[in-house]
């Protein structure tokens, strides 16, 4: 069969139509039924024909007729009956009903036909309706026993609530209910006469006053969608009313969108449509127009040139839709309200049945003038809702986001947490650092403070503060002035507004690092600026600040210290001059600069801002609380913020301050964060916050700050507490100012501090548990000789006492003291001193211990700080003495980092007191230490030997702990020394070598003493940790090391110097920091960056800021940058660690030197507790150290190197204390050298870096 191919495409049209089925053509026409993408006209002009097609129609709730109110008599009688039964003068109830549109749609009628007695609400005074149904109108009623003609139905509060409810209804997406456009209240009263009941009824309703004008216009094409066809059909017209919105396509045809369609809230809208109504003036139309105008959900409302929008009405009486353009009436642009009232009286009879068919009728009118109207107008004029916000919504609906739409980014931003305004130089407005290691300290150059420190006190306070500085420098007795601190105490209640407290500043990097103080609240711009200076003063040695910024300090004296006006004001209220003193004093006496401050006593310590100041986010800026006190310049905010002397800065600081010379007082103890203060410090006018709980019993609040210096054990009252340092002395008079700083601590910073404290405590507890579990294993494990020794020693001391010093964010710098300390109060106290000397020194320095520990630490710092090296008169001392526990506490950590139980601290106090009872011993120790310091060369050799012995130990950290223990023991009474030599054979060769070295120094250590056992336990625990994770044990946290050492040099296998410094700055009390700084300064050379850091006299400021910057805390890029410019010696750090086995111990928490220093400082601390003489001695050496000027850091390091080594090796009993203080100071100053030594000795090679701040400043800014 032949097939013919036909080309249909070529067929004529008439043939094609006849040959192809119609069904096949539907596919080709399908495109006709497809809606093209809808796009709004590009031009929003002339969207429809605006020419009027009829008369204007006004739309309003009550435009044509006032609302009518129908009250069913039965409901009224029920209300009266309940009111009479309650026998109350005022009975609250509800009337429920409905609101309906009149049949002619010209008004509304309210019918109240139900009574609701309401139900009591728990926790609320008012009642709630029990049977409210959707669509009901709720009328709260007050039924009064007696009619009061002068009373009003609404109260001001009621009116405000009504305004808000109405506004919310207009702006929300809630279902449109006409009843919500009117809020009604009633006041009823009834008087009985025979069988007659006379009711007085007062009604008041609030509704929207916006009137709209609708003008008929020509029809606008509508896209024939299913919805449009349905609405146009007869069936659709008879259905319930519907409503929606109108949009347009590119052809300017209207597209109907239902109210529930989500597209309505994204597409441009040109109006609204409604169905199921008859007339345009229907109140429903008015209500829907208001919703369209004021809805905050409709993002794009397009109005015509005349500000009108379309209204399409599918009327019940018209087949085709009606078109109107509508706009608010003239003068009705804003969302406003009107009051409708009605008052009437009626008489009912008791025995007459209520009429069912005739309700009581009332008419609500806006024309009535009465007291209700007056009140309404008054409240309306004051209402924000009726003003700009609502008005703007009506005026420009398309651009207006209604009040409910106030979730704009800006407003959200306002509600979201963010930094407080920092009206300070851009350089200072660096982002707040919220490091994972919150204790990271910022180093700011003392110069960071404005040259113009605000002198809140005025010229007189300034001079006073200067004089205070002088006092601090000149006489410890002046410290007694710190008694004025009670004023400060008052200010403590006021948390400092400063946010920066968490990021303490070292004076040097003032510009680079957080200009915390300056960034403080603008209102305290001066204060805050001062605060930085204060901080710097504290951080930097007061001498440095005095020398370097004395010129500015004298003028800005009050300002730096008074950087917080609030605190100052508080202080000024009680002691106007004191605050200034405090301001000026703190910088001067802040740390190692005590000497300088003495040299420049007249100068306001404020200049200290230029000095290095170590600020602990938690600990007070000043090395010692007294320093905090002295810091008139000291950052007041930090005082209150960190010192814990905020509320009681003056008094509280004074005790600690006195005990803690800038050298001896651990900054952490005195400088507690607000959280710390609350934790460990009480707002005691006479005691430094830390000192309060930690203030030894011998401390007497009455003694004032100086009294705290007094060691009850010793029975010696050193008005010049360990804070004999000029800074402390000056501080005493200025202490009141400390309150100001406290008051400045911002709530968010305070919360952060509290949270950090809590986290630290949790971490400490965890670490304690870990250590305890590990300690058992270490005892069994033969790997760790130190651990074995510890178990040997531990048995003697119950494991009750366990102190964990943690360098938060520094790695785990931990020390676990043997329980022996707790078992024997005396021994434990001595041990605790040994142990805590490492700890307590550090603790005092870093305020690492928990509250209990802080208390004990405070006792130490207060007791020992004055003269005991163990309370690091110099940072080194603190570190060394606290090497075991305290060092792990992280020289900078402060109380929060390490935990001590009060029992431990108490026992320590007892033992310390007993030990202190032997002033001769401590004097001898000090003498020996001084002689050792003098013989720097010999000391250096000895240190090298010690280092070698340490290197011999299996684990540097264990060895270090062991060596530290002997040192600590040596610092402890000689009884312990004797025991130490008889220590179990388990002790490492390093221990033996160390003991030999100590004996060569003339120091006898009894390894068997309880203290020694405790020390051993501590060492062993550290050893265990080191074996498990050397980095964890050697975290480079040596803020105390002296703080600067670990900061400056590699103190541990893990480069935690930055964290250590940060922790030290944050958690060490001012006294601790001052001791560290003083120690550094005392060591005549500022060889150690740490010395410079703490001390940061005018001599060397460059090291401080960088000390905080350790590779562990830097990004790779930052590390490379620092190395590129020679700011970091990361590689050297490992070598230094190897060089200095003692430094290895510092990696454990403090260098061995630190341990020795700490041991010495512990002994000194005890001596201080026992006798003030030791404190005096310590202070003197510190002063000398400070006095010794060293122009070059290298020279300082060189000079301090031998001394530090001597401390490391020969922190023996009497020498230990003397040498320890000096060594600590020297070590701080020679931290770099020690760290270098560590590089050699420490196989774990701490990554600590020595940063040259001076060079760093010259480089481009990283932050």
Curated annotation (Swiss-Prot):
GO terms for cellular component: cell cortex; centriole; cytoplasm; cytosol; microtubule organizing center; procentriole replication complex. Residues 395-432, 455-614, 778-803, 818-884, 954-988, 1210-1243 are annotated as: Disordered. InterPro entries: Sil. Residues 540-554, 589-602 have a biased composition (Low complexity). Its main location: cytoplasm. Plays an essential role in early embryonic development. Plays an important role in the regulation of centriole duplication and directional cell motility. PANTHER family: SCL-INTERRUPTING LOCUS PROTEIN, TAL1 SCL INTERRUPTING LOCUS. Disulfide bonds: none annotated. The keyword Cytoplasm applies. Keywords: Cytoplasm, Cytoskeleton, Developmental protein. It is found in: Cytoplasm, Cytosol; Cytoplasm, Cytoskeleton, Microtubule organizing center, Centrosome, Centriole; Cytoplasm, Cell cortex. The keyword Chaperone does not apply. This is SCL-interrupting locus protein homolog. GO terms for biological process: body morphogenesis; microtubule organizing center organization; mitotic spindle organization; neuron cellular homeostasis; positive regulation of centriole replication; positive regulation of G1/S transition of mitotic cell cycle; positive regulation of mitotic spindle organization; positive regulation of spindle assembly. Disruption phenotype: Embryos display defects such as small head, small eyes and dorsally bent body. Residues 455-468, 516-530, 555-575, 781-803, 818-849, 870-884, 965-981 have a biased composition (Polar residues). Residues 850-865, 1214-1230 have a biased composition (Basic and acidic residues).
